[in-house]
Protein backbone atom coordinates (compact mmCIF):
# COMPACT_ATOMS: atom_id res chain seq x y z
CA UNK A 1 0.00 0.00 0.00
CA UNK A 2 2.65 2.49 1.03
CA UNK A 3 6.38 2.29 1.61
CA UNK A 4 6.04 4.30 4.83
CA UNK A 5 2.76 3.05 6.23
CA UNK A 6 4.09 0.17 8.33
CA UNK A 7 6.99 1.76 10.15
CA UNK A 8 6.56 -0.12 13.41
CA UNK A 9 6.25 -3.65 14.72
CA UNK A 10 3.56 -4.12 17.35
CA UNK A 11 3.93 -6.47 20.31
CA UNK A 12 1.18 -7.85 22.52
CA UNK A 13 2.70 -10.06 25.25
CA UNK A 14 0.96 -13.25 26.31
CA UNK A 15 -1.11 -12.83 29.46
CA UNK A 16 -3.59 -14.46 31.80
CA UNK A 17 -6.57 -12.22 32.60
CA UNK A 18 -8.82 -12.33 35.65
CA UNK A 19 -12.48 -13.14 35.12
CA UNK A 20 -14.44 -9.97 34.50
CA UNK A 21 -11.54 -8.14 32.82
CA UNK A 22 -12.58 -5.83 29.99
CA UNK A 23 -10.59 -4.91 26.92
CA UNK A 24 -10.93 -1.41 25.54
CA UNK A 25 -11.08 -1.29 21.74
CA UNK A 26 -9.67 1.58 19.70
CA UNK A 27 -10.00 1.97 15.95
CA UNK A 28 -6.75 0.75 14.45
CA UNK A 29 -6.46 3.59 11.92
CA UNK A 30 -7.69 6.59 13.93
CA UNK A 31 -7.13 5.62 17.57
CA UNK A 32 -10.77 6.53 18.31
CA UNK A 33 -12.26 4.64 21.28
CA UNK A 34 -15.07 2.42 19.97
CA UNK A 35 -16.08 0.43 23.05
CA UNK A 36 -15.09 -2.49 25.21
CA UNK A 37 -15.42 -6.25 25.10
CA UNK A 38 -14.75 -8.99 27.65
CA UNK A 39 -11.11 -10.04 27.63
CA UNK A 40 -10.23 -13.68 27.00
CA UNK A 41 -8.98 -15.66 30.00
CA UNK A 42 -5.66 -16.18 28.21
CA UNK A 43 -4.10 -14.23 25.34
CA UNK A 44 -1.13 -15.30 23.23
CA UNK A 45 2.09 -13.50 22.37
CA UNK A 46 1.83 -11.50 19.13
CA UNK A 47 4.64 -9.78 17.27
CA UNK A 48 3.63 -7.99 14.09
CA UNK A 49 0.99 -10.08 12.36
CA UNK A 50 1.97 -13.50 13.75
CA UNK A 51 1.44 -15.14 17.12
CA UNK A 52 3.31 -17.69 19.19
CA UNK A 53 1.32 -20.54 17.57
CA UNK A 54 2.39 -19.42 14.07
CA UNK A 55 -1.04 -18.08 13.19
CA UNK A 56 -0.69 -15.10 10.89
CA UNK A 57 -3.30 -12.70 9.56
CA UNK A 58 -2.84 -10.16 6.77
CA UNK A 59 -5.43 -7.97 5.09
CA UNK A 60 -6.20 -5.96 2.02
CA UNK A 61 -9.04 -3.48 1.71
CA UNK A 62 -11.50 -3.70 -1.15
CA UNK A 63 -13.87 -1.06 0.17
CA UNK A 64 -17.26 -2.38 -0.84
CA UNK A 65 -20.50 -0.47 -0.49
CA UNK A 66 -20.34 2.57 1.77
CA UNK A 67 -23.90 1.99 2.99
CA UNK A 68 -22.78 -1.28 4.61
CA UNK A 69 -20.37 0.37 7.05
CA UNK A 70 -21.78 0.51 10.59
CA UNK A 71 -20.14 3.38 12.51
CA UNK A 72 -21.68 2.06 15.75
CA UNK A 73 -19.79 -1.25 15.52
CA UNK A 74 -17.06 -1.73 18.11
CA UNK A 75 -14.70 -3.85 16.02
CA UNK A 76 -12.75 -2.48 13.03
CA UNK A 77 -10.63 -4.61 10.71
CA UNK A 78 -7.30 -3.78 12.37
CA UNK A 79 -8.51 -4.48 15.90
CA UNK A 80 -10.11 -7.67 14.60
CA UNK A 81 -6.76 -8.94 13.36
CA UNK A 82 -4.86 -8.34 16.60
CA UNK A 83 -7.61 -9.57 18.91
CA UNK A 84 -7.93 -12.76 16.84
CA UNK A 85 -4.16 -13.32 16.90
CA UNK A 86 -4.16 -12.98 20.67
CA UNK A 87 -6.97 -15.54 21.01
CA UNK A 88 -6.27 -18.21 18.35
CA UNK A 89 -4.08 -21.30 18.04
CA UNK A 90 -5.13 -22.17 14.45
CA UNK A 91 -6.35 -20.40 11.33
CA UNK A 92 -9.80 -21.97 11.69
CA UNK A 93 -10.01 -20.80 15.28
CA UNK A 94 -9.04 -17.28 14.15
CA UNK A 95 -11.90 -17.31 11.62
CA UNK A 96 -14.29 -18.33 14.39
CA UNK A 97 -12.96 -15.67 16.77
CA UNK A 98 -13.18 -12.95 14.12
CA UNK A 99 -16.69 -13.79 12.97
CA UNK A 100 -17.99 -14.25 16.52
CA UNK A 101 -16.59 -10.88 17.60
CA UNK A 102 -18.23 -8.93 14.76
CA UNK A 103 -21.50 -10.81 15.22
CA UNK A 104 -21.64 -9.85 18.89
CA UNK A 105 -20.07 -6.38 18.90
CA UNK A 106 -20.57 -5.08 15.37
CA UNK A 107 -18.18 -4.40 12.49
CA UNK A 108 -17.31 -0.81 11.63
CA UNK A 109 -15.05 -1.16 8.58
CA UNK A 110 -15.60 -1.44 4.85
CA UNK A 111 -14.94 -4.54 2.79
CA UNK A 112 -11.83 -6.46 3.82
CA UNK A 113 -10.07 -9.51 2.50
CA UNK A 114 -8.10 -11.36 5.17
CA UNK A 115 -5.45 -14.01 4.61
CA UNK A 116 -5.40 -16.26 7.67
CA UNK A 117 -2.79 -19.01 7.92
CA UNK A 118 -1.13 -21.44 10.30
CA UNK A 119 1.51 -24.13 9.62
CA UNK A 120 -1.15 -26.52 8.26
CA UNK A 121 -3.58 -24.44 6.20
CA UNK A 122 -4.31 -21.03 4.74
CA UNK A 123 -7.65 -19.28 4.17
CA UNK A 124 -8.99 -16.22 2.42
CA UNK A 125 -11.88 -14.61 4.29
CA UNK A 126 -13.80 -11.68 2.87
CA UNK A 127 -16.05 -9.59 5.07
CA UNK A 128 -18.47 -6.69 4.68
CA UNK A 129 -20.65 -5.00 7.25
CA UNK A 130 -24.44 -5.01 7.28
CA UNK A 131 -24.94 -1.26 7.53
CA UNK A 132 -26.04 1.05 10.36
CA UNK A 133 -29.31 -0.76 10.96
CA UNK A 134 -27.72 -4.20 11.54
CA UNK A 135 -24.99 -5.46 13.85
CA UNK A 136 -22.56 -8.01 12.50
CA UNK A 137 -21.04 -8.83 9.14
CA UNK A 138 -21.52 -11.00 6.10
CA UNK A 139 -18.49 -13.12 5.28
CA UNK A 140 -17.13 -16.07 3.31
CA UNK A 141 -13.91 -17.99 4.00
CA UNK A 142 -12.34 -20.38 1.49
CA UNK A 143 -9.40 -22.64 2.23
CA UNK A 144 -6.50 -22.24 -0.16
CA UNK A 145 -5.63 -25.71 -1.51
CA UNK A 146 -2.23 -27.06 -0.47
CA UNK A 147 -0.89 -26.93 -4.05
CA UNK A 148 -1.91 -23.30 -4.65
CA UNK A 149 -0.82 -19.78 -3.79
CA UNK A 150 -2.81 -16.59 -3.37
CA UNK A 151 -1.95 -12.90 -3.45
CA UNK A 152 -3.69 -9.77 -2.22
CA UNK A 153 -4.82 -7.26 -4.82
CA UNK A 154 -6.94 -4.65 -2.99
CA UNK A 155 -10.11 -6.11 -4.41
CA UNK A 156 -12.54 -8.83 -3.46
CA UNK A 157 -11.40 -12.19 -4.83
CA UNK A 158 -14.10 -14.65 -3.85
CA UNK A 159 -16.61 -14.64 -6.70
CA UNK A 160 -18.25 -18.03 -6.15
CA UNK A 161 -18.11 -20.46 -3.27
CA UNK A 162 -19.18 -24.08 -2.71
CA UNK A 163 -22.01 -23.97 -0.17
CA UNK A 164 -21.85 -27.71 0.50
CA UNK A 165 -18.09 -28.03 1.11
CA UNK A 166 -18.01 -27.37 4.87
CA UNK A 167 -14.42 -28.60 5.12
CA UNK A 168 -13.04 -25.96 2.76
CA UNK A 169 -15.69 -23.24 2.75
CA UNK A 170 -17.17 -21.39 5.71
CA UNK A 171 -19.68 -18.54 5.55
CA UNK A 172 -22.11 -16.49 7.59
CA UNK A 173 -25.50 -18.14 8.01
CA UNK A 174 -27.26 -15.25 6.28
CA UNK A 175 -24.84 -14.61 3.41
CA UNK A 176 -27.38 -15.37 0.66
CA UNK A 177 -30.44 -14.09 2.51
CA UNK A 178 -28.72 -10.76 3.21
CA UNK A 179 -27.62 -10.35 -0.42
CA UNK A 180 -31.15 -11.06 -1.64
CA UNK A 181 -32.74 -8.67 0.87
CA UNK A 182 -30.40 -5.90 -0.32
CA UNK A 183 -31.01 -6.73 -3.99
CA UNK A 184 -27.38 -7.69 -4.62
CA UNK A 185 -28.11 -11.33 -5.62
Show which residues each predicted segment covers.
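A contiguous strand-loop segment
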Residues: 1-76, 97-185
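Second-shell loop/turn segments in exported
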Residues: 67-71, 79-88
Amino acid sequence: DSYGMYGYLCHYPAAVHAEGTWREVYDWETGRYTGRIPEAAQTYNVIGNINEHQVTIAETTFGGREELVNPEGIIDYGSLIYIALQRSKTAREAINVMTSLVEEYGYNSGGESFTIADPNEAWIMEMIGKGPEHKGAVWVAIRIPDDCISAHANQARIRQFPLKDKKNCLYSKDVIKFAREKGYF
